[in-house]
Amino acid sequence: MDGLQSLGDVTAEIFGLPLEGHSVQESKPLKTEDEPQGAPLKPLVFRVDESTPGLVQSVLLERGWDKFDEQRQDVEDWNLYWRSSSFRRAEYVNVKPWQRLNHHPGMTNLTRKDCLAKHLARMRSRYGESLYEFTPLTFIMPTDYTKFVAKYFKEKQDLGTKPSYWICKPAELSRGRGIIIFSDIRDLMFKGTYVVQKYICNPLLVGRYKCDLRIYVCITGFKPLTIYMYQEGLVRFATEKFDLRNLEDYYSHLTNSSINKLGASYQKIKEVVGQGCKWTLSRFFSYLRNWDVDDLLLRQKISHMVILTVLAMAPSVPVTYNCFELFGFDILIDDNLKPWLLEVNYNPALTLDCSTDESVKRSLVHDVIELLYLNGLRSEEKKCGRTSPGNSVVSLARSHHHEFCATPNSSSYASLIEFTTGSKSDPAVQNICPKHTRTSQLREMMSRRDRLLTKEAAKSKPRHKAWHLPRKMVFPYASQSQPHKMKGPAGDLPEAGSTPNDHAGNFVLIFPFNKATFRASRNGLNVKRIIQELQKLMNK
């Protein structure tokens, strides 16, 4: 097919699911193998602070990375900095070409409940109610208090004796903290900035228990806008049976595991749900299929919702380079099988509270790293004869000693190779590429590889797959608007416009989904054009 296939045409393929069983591929244990012939490279280096999840550190060590030690390593001698708190502007400006940060700037527009509500309301007024009807009616307090009161009493008059239900959430808090569910306005209390939303009274129940979905989304860049959705995920259950007659029973109405793991029924074997309060997403979809539900259609609706949500805030993201971010989208399914966006979580929890967490989150972190640093360099080394005979299978743990590419997305980004082939005496080059560090070994090897590939380039014609160019060593994605730019010689900045890889591990590309959306996002976002393409897709 000419061009990247649409989500609608290849839903099963996009999500990597067979027609029957819909099993999700698990990350396999890593094994150690001998290094191939040639000068060995030291491991890549990750940097942490006190907020870095222990699971992230554990996974990186499993993959053969080293932990940064400021006492014995150069201040710039690291490749990945993963922490819970956001980075300062100076850290974004000074990030080096071989480094990655796990946050984009300006993400509160997506993860703060009041900011998200404002952006979605703006998109709804501009592009129509029907397109953005996946969020409940929302009021921001105290700004919208008068509007809310008017709506409350109008609805009360329309419904007569039938109650209406609302939920009030703090704009900045998570894990179910500070939430109030009410039907009587006299019970509404708030201090500070809150959002009040129409409470969804008809959730899809599993064995009479309410649940929601934690969908993991990774945004690897904003120029072009590049969104991946994880095939696996979590389904979180309330631990008491759903009952609108008792709005104060949070174990019945809230699905946050931080609350329900403390409930009296957490360890009990509950109807259908079983013990605990979590399922894997694949188990949930298997349950739906047993009731003749088209789970692929539901997945497709969720992917559209994610794209539309990110589009609401993407134009406001400042220019940054070498960043990525993992988000947790919380989605509730009602009894009409309509998905509703509840909120988007910054730093989704990576704690391991149960065996379901272990199976999902450990693979998730592995696949985030896989998404960022696939072993493309190792495959190129093999072409150049650097792999020892009989060692055609290379483990991920060892391949990461030599890898350093972004998603293998066949782009024309300026690479680390291109930057380091300039004059070694150039002060700018010396500043960007310090000598005698772990990463300096990597840069030197990449330079040798570049010279070899240049000699062989004329002998072979690259094979195209759909609209992707051949895989090559590339830079991480760029981002979008521009309050500031990275400093340094022109050669150290990635070019815009690379075509993303369609998957990595269990992550699948959901945007861009065709040539038109790629062109509409590679040099700044043409939101109107993207919306038009998405509407075509949704109307098929």
UniProtKB/Swiss-Prot annotation:
Its EC number is 6.-.-.-. Residues 41-384 form the TTL domain. PROSITE patterns: TTL (PS51221). Pfam families: TTL. Mg(2+) 1 binds at D330, E343. Keywords: ATP-binding, Ligase, Magnesium, Metal-binding, Nucleotide-binding. GO terms for molecular function: ATP binding; metal ion binding; tubulin-glutamic acid ligase activity. It is an enzyme of class 6 (ligase). Arg-175 is the main determinant for regioselectivity, which segregates between initiases and elongases in all tubulin--tyrosine ligase family. A glutamine residue at this position is found in elongases TTLL6, TTLL9, TTLL11, TTLL13, TTLL10 and favors glutamate-chain elongation, whereas an arginine residue is found in initiases TTLL2, TTLL4, TTLL5, TTLL3, TTLL8 and favors initiation. This is Probable tubulin polyglutamylase TTLL2. It comes from Mus musculus.
